[in-house]
Amino acid sequence: MATRFKHQFSISLALTFFFFFTKTFSFTENEELGNLLRFKASFDDPKGSLSGWFNTSSSHHCNWTGITCTRAPTLYVSSINLQSLNLSGEISDSICDLPYLTHLDLSLNFFNQPIPLQLSRCVTLETLNLSSNLIWGTIPDQISEFSSLKVIDFSSNHVEGMIPEDLGLLFNLQVLNLGSNLLTGIVPPAIGKLSELVVLDLSENSYLVSEIPSFLGKLDKLEQLLLHRSGFHGEIPTSFVGLTSLRTLDLSLNNLSGEIPRSLGPSLKNLVSLDVSQNKLSGSFPSGICSGKRLINLSLHSNFFEGSLPNSIGECLSLERLQVQNNGFSGEFPVVLWKLPRIKIIRADNNRFTGQVPESVSLASALEQVEIVNNSFSGEIPHGLGLVKSLYKFSASQNRFSGELPPNFCDSPVLSIVNISHNRLLGKIPELKNCKKLVSLSLAGNAFTGEIPPSLADLHVLTYLDLSDNSLTGLIPQGLQNLKLALFNVSFNGLSGEVPHSLVSGLPASFLQGNPELCGPGLPNSCSSDRSNFHKKGGKALVLSLICLALAIATFLAVLYRYSRKKVQFKSTWRSEFYYPFKLTEHELMKVVNESCPSGSEVYVLSLSSGELLAVKKLVNSKNISSKSLKAQVRTIAKIRHKNITRILGFCFKDEMIFLIYEFTQNGSLHDMLSRAGDQLPWSIRLKIALGVAQALAYISKDYVPHLLHRNLKSANIFLDKDFEPKLSDFALDHIVGETAFQSLVHANTNSCYTAPENHYSKKATEDMDVYSFGVVLLELVTGQSAEKAEEGSSGESLDIVKQVRRKINLTDGAAQVLDQKILSDSCQSDMRKTLDIALDCTAVAAEKRPSLVKVIKLLEGISSSVSPVSA
């Protein structure tokens, strides 16, 4: 009886626990779902990235975007990763009621608020990543309330002020990343108490001005220490010998001085990367730096180091990148460096090295770049160099190399850049037909003899060719005119004969001088005088015969043309011309481009099968410019090389459509950046953009031949690369599509606010008009306001940005009200006012009152020199 009772009791107890846990699990699951929905409700989600977050029995919340669940023992939310979803709004603490949440990643979004202290309620949270947002304000003392955190990443925001001492109370912290912010002051001693720290990143905080604190040497678990591009000065602490776990040390781009501690190298046996470049360090090469045999990257460049490189560097069997350029190193360059099995990059420019490049360089099978300009290397360039099939850059100008180039010099299938100018090389230039990817070849200032190899014409991507100051003879090969040469310099040789016409028309005369036997248009010798005897000796009969033959051929071709045209009257032809080695088919292009787009100008992003991204600009050629003329005009513009001008990589055309193919820029247009996230562009970046655009405009209108005007400058035609370097686009389109089509394009796609007043009645485009458009772009940079956003005046009239600004600055303290309040600070207000004055001068109604581009550049450079760089 007792046994039966016990059995019934056990069953009852089990059922009780079952129903209890079932109810608990059901309650917890519903609670989790509700917390997540409240968390989502606080966001602005313009792309609908979280549209799948809704209450439905068909989709468990553990399967929602960004949600990861863990069994503990049943399924619970443990991680939320909403990286790069264009989210904004407020960060709610409703997720702190998720009892097992350990990981929260909201990086690469647009959250615009102070550091959310309310998340300190998340008592189980171990990782908090808010990097690459618009987080602003200081790090509060209450940061210590995040007691469970192991990872803090607030990098790439607008966090300012001093690093609080209370940060040192987070004893569990393993990763602290505060890089790319606006922090000031010193690194507090409390950071030295974070004994579990593995990663410390305080880089790119230019106002963090102090010596590197010695207490950092106590962090013996530290594997990454990143202090680059900040305001650190003084010496490298000797206490760093205590960082025995360190793998990456980056102190570059600071103001450090003194020597590298002698015991540092032997102590850091786990070191993989050491970068102390661009400081003011001195002394000798750090001894024992390869004692751990793990070093991959060694960057000592742009300092004041001297002495020789020790042969012990041969112990660096893992070394891939050696950068020691721009120092005072001397002595023989270690032979062992040339045969390291993993070495990829050797940069030793601007030192006083001697020695030779040995035949054993062939053992460096991974070698990609050699840059040893301005040293005292000697001997012959070895046959072994041609056996390195990975080599794509060999730059060794201003040395003492002698002898002939080996026949296999250009056998690397990826070789793109060769500069061996200003040496003592001699003999004939070898056949370089294997260098199919050669873009730049400079052999200037040597003693080469013989003729220019005709095979150079087979190098279809060759863009720069400098053969000046040699002893070359013979004719300039006709085939060279088929290349897209941005530079062709054969001055001071012994060349003779007629210069191919297209080469003469696109070259400065100085690139041909010093060849008295050359003749052609614009040269001292006219080739027609050489044929005078032909006319004197009865060549008229031959001329008449040739004319008759030409007429017969022309008649035949005309008949053939009319016949063929009838057959293909309705058949369109696809044509293309590329200046860089990539493949693009009509199918790939038309897959991206909708042919029913309205006339005007559109930009598409095209992804090739290789993964490379291209920008494609669609234009309408309403004038039906001939194929020959179109090619000539695009080639003229494609030859332009300037760091602030977008490269044209090629073009395609079909019927009345033209597609210009540009290099892709990662950060889009200035217009989009200002509209979307203007406060991500601090003043130093905006000033860099202004100066770059002005320099690009001046280059195309004054330095480049033929002189060009932009005629369509606006913020939407200024693109930004990954470093926010401006790239000018869409200039001189009138040369490509013709004036009529260009005017239609401008009227359809450009707001008149960018257009100079005289453009409405003047028949001639001028530099003053470009200056006016540039002034409007300057106003956008200074005010943060889109030029296309008109306001209504007191009388009901529409005011463009120029009129708006001019009216506002007439009010009391109006100039200060005009400046972009999102980035305005005491440190930049004066410079922003100066730039505003330049913008107002550029947008003067009377063209003659506007400054020249040269003057604008000088004024902007004067402002730029006083601005401290701040990372965007």
Swiss-Prot record:
This is Probably inactive leucine-rich repeat receptor-like protein kinase At5g06940. Residues 1-26 form the signal peptide. The modification Phosphothreonine is found at residue 585. Its main location: membrane. The modification Phosphotyrosine is found at residues 662, 699, 754, 761. The keyword Transmembrane applies. It is a single-pass type I membrane protein. Pfam families: LRR_1, LRRNT_2, PK_Tyr_Ser-Thr. One of its GO terms (cellular component) is membrane. Gene3D superfamilies: Phosphorylase Kinase, domain 1, Ribonuclease Inhibitor, Transferase(Phosphotransferase) domain 1. Glycans are attached at residues 55, 63, 86, 129, 255, 297, 374, 419, 489. One of its GO terms (molecular function) is protein kinase activity. It comes from Arabidopsis thaliana (Mouse-ear cress). The protein kinase domain is predicted to be catalytically inactive. Lacks the conserved Asp active site at position 712, which is replaced by an Asn residue. It is found in: Membrane. ATP binds at residues 595-603, 617. Keywords: ATP-binding, Glycoprotein, Leucine-rich repeat, Membrane, Nucleotide-binding, Phosphoprotein, Receptor, Repeat, Signal, Transferase, Transmembrane, Transmembrane helix. Residues 27-540 are extracellular. The keyword Transmembrane helix applies. Residues 562-872 are cytoplasmic. The chain crosses the membrane at residues 541-561. LRR repeats lie at residues 79-98, 99-122, 123-146, 147-169, 171-193, 195-217, 219-243, 244-267, 269-292, 294-316, 317-340, 341-365, 367-389, 391-412, 413-435, 436-459, 460-482, 484-506. Residues 589-863 form the Protein kinase domain. Belongs to the protein kinase superfamily. Ser/Thr protein kinase family.
